[in-house]
Amino acid sequence: MAKKILYQDNARKALEKGMDTLVEAVAITLGPKGRNVVLERKFGAPQIINDGVTIAKEIELQDLAENTGVALIRQAASKTNDVAGDGTTTATVLAHAIVKQGLKNVAAGANPITLKKGIQKAVKFVVGKIAEYSKPICSMQDVTHIGSISSGNDVEVGTMIANAIQQVGKEGIISLEEGQSTSTELDIKEGMKFDKGFISPYFVTDTSRMEVIQDNPYILITDKKITLIQQELLPILEKVTKTGRPLLIIAEDIEKEALATIIVNKLRGIINVVAVRAPGFGDRRKLLLEDIAILTSGVVITQDMGLSLDSMSLDQLGSARRVQITKDSTTIVADAQKDLIQARCDQIRRQLEAATNSYAKDKLHERLAKLSGGVAVVKVGAATETEMRDKKLRLEDAINATKAAIEEGIVPGGGSTFVHLSEVLRVWAINNLVEEELVGALIIVDSLLHPLKRIVENAGNNGSIIIEKIKNSNFSTGYNADIGQIVDMYKEGIIDPAKVTRSALQNAASIASMILTTECLIAEQVDN
């Protein structure tokens, strides 16, 4: 297909036009009085949402040159969402403001490369100041405030997230599920859970609930496929039978004949046994089995270590306080040795620092949560499917924002941190930068005012007047758009995670700098 090539101002203008379209759709959701956006669906009900990154992902323009502008600014939102999980609308508004100011200067003859250097220096300075001013989270009340604000001022959600974090710890997993009722509920799963259930329904002990419950069982952990019951399993089964305790077998798989023999012994009441397949695949399976072994104080019977099933002893079996197995999942509640668990968690944290792709990071986070804290499940309740989707997105933002706040602390919310730091940046830039680098830094000074301005305008007031009032007050002062008053943000609980504030600015400036230094745009030529 033929290509359309645009140069200089024409290229930048096309990108700007696309950005204008996207930003207007996203910015109307900003702040406590931000409005909703309805997404039309070819199949199923329309979706009503208030989530910046989801709206940004939906927008596709007919003009492919303008659509490139949409795609670029969408990156600022997506990257912020990946890093901090919230602040996507703020990142979009900031990126747009930087591009708008920057393009005016480029059109007036400024050198985009020097402007970019000024922008980068200014952002580095502001990020340092955000870290300096951020306060660590001191109480569960702070966690509640963060959760409430990020979920659209829903105190009930904030309290629920605070309770979940208190139960599972900051490294625990909080997952979202669609509930069956109209109210949102919190369910805490104790112990380690993995997504493999019993191999055969003949193992079930509670037929009404179709599950297996074992108290104080031994646990045999192996990465082998069990094929020969006489040679491989019989010796250890006899030893376990003498103790009178139940046995859980976690293996790669069990051959039909071996499985049949185990089931017959179970049904005759000779031994209380249940078999499940090992979780995961390949190398990850071995790591998960090692995690289970550490949790249950057992040993993984593997050829790599020179261990075999026929020669194993009771000491090599793990043990647990309680095991609950359904057809889809296994939950092990064990009294593990704290020092061994801590060492394993530290090892996983080091792997997390070195991990590059998001899939590997997610899986490591999952392992860390299972070992260290446990899992909290929030069952989202709503009257309609449309409300359910909106609630899920808000809850997702709230959970991410809360975790970000625990990591890097909190700063005054509602865009007020940016307003206060814009004045600090102005003084620093005038004293430390010259010529076009100074112009680049002053672009950031002006752009930092835009998130608050938009929040105020969405609440139906004059942004410029409020900004002037906040500039002349102390750092914790900001604007409560909900009641339309200037207040102490910490006292009112209007706080943002420092990580979200920082990421929004860094990603916005990164994308905006790239757009400003664009001199040529190549896009598909669309025939009318």
Curated annotation (Swiss-Prot):
<dbReference type="InterPro" id="IPR027413">
    <property type="entry name" value="GROEL-like_equatorial_sf"/>
</dbReference>
<dbReference type="InterPro" id="IPR002423">
    <property type="entry name" value="Cpn60/GroEL/TCP-1"/>
</dbReference>
<feature type="binding site">
    <location>
        <begin position="86"/>
        <end position="90"/>
    </location>
    <ligand>
        <name>ATP</name>
    </ligand>
</feature>
<dbReference type="InterPro" id="IPR027410">
    <property type="entry name" value="TCP-1-like_intermed_sf"/>
</dbReference>
<keyword id="KW-0150">Chloroplast</keyword>
<dbReference type="GO" id="GO:0009507">
    <property type="term" value="C:chloroplast"/>
</dbReference>
<keyword id="KW-0934">Plastid</keyword>
<feature type="binding site">
    <location>
        <position position="496"/>
    </location>
    <ligand>
        <name>ATP</name>
    </ligand>
</feature>
<dbReference type="GO" id="GO:0016853">
    <property type="term" value="F:isomerase activity"/>
</dbReference>
<dbReference type="Pfam" id="PF00118">
    <property type="entry name" value="Cpn60_TCP1"/>
</dbReference>
<dbReference type="GO" id="GO:0140662">
    <property type="term" value="F:ATP-dependent protein folding chaperone"/>
</dbReference>
<keyword id="KW-0143">Chaperone</keyword>
<feature type="binding site">
    <location>
        <position position="414"/>
    </location>
    <ligand>
        <name>ATP</name>
    </ligand>
</feature>
<dbReference type="GO" id="GO:0005524">
    <property type="term" value="F:ATP binding"/>
</dbReference>
<comment type="subunit">
    <text>Forms a cylinder of 14 subunits composed of two heptameric rings stacked back-to-back. Interacts with the co-chaperonin GroES.</text>
</comment>
<keyword id="KW-0413">Isomerase</keyword>
<dbReference type="InterPro" id="IPR027409">
    <property type="entry name" value="GroEL-like_apical_dom_sf"/>
</dbReference>
<dbReference type="GO" id="GO:0051082">
    <property type="term" value="F:unfolded protein binding"/>
</dbReference>
<keyword id="KW-0067">ATP-binding</keyword>
<dbReference type="GO" id="GO:0042026">
    <property type="term" value="P:protein refolding"/>
</dbReference>
<feature type="binding site">
    <location>
        <begin position="29"/>
        <end position="32"/>
    </location>
    <ligand>
        <name>ATP</name>
    </ligand>
</feature>
<protein>
    <recommendedName>
        <fullName>Chaperonin GroEL, chloroplastic</fullName>
        <ecNumber>5.6.1.7</ecNumber>
    </recommendedName>
</protein>
<comment type="function">
    <text>Together with its co-chaperonin GroES, plays an essential role in assisting protein folding. The GroEL-GroES system forms a nano-cage that allows encapsulation of the non-native substrate proteins and provides a physical environment optimized to promote and accelerate protein folding.</text>
</comment>
<comment type="similarity">
    <text>Belongs to the chaperonin (HSP60) family.</text>
</comment>
<dbReference type="InterPro" id="IPR001844">
    <property type="entry name" value="Cpn60/GroEL"/>
</dbReference>
<keyword id="KW-0547">Nucleotide-binding</keyword>
<dbReference type="InterPro" id="IPR018370">
    <property type="entry name" value="Chaperonin_Cpn60_CS"/>
</dbReference>
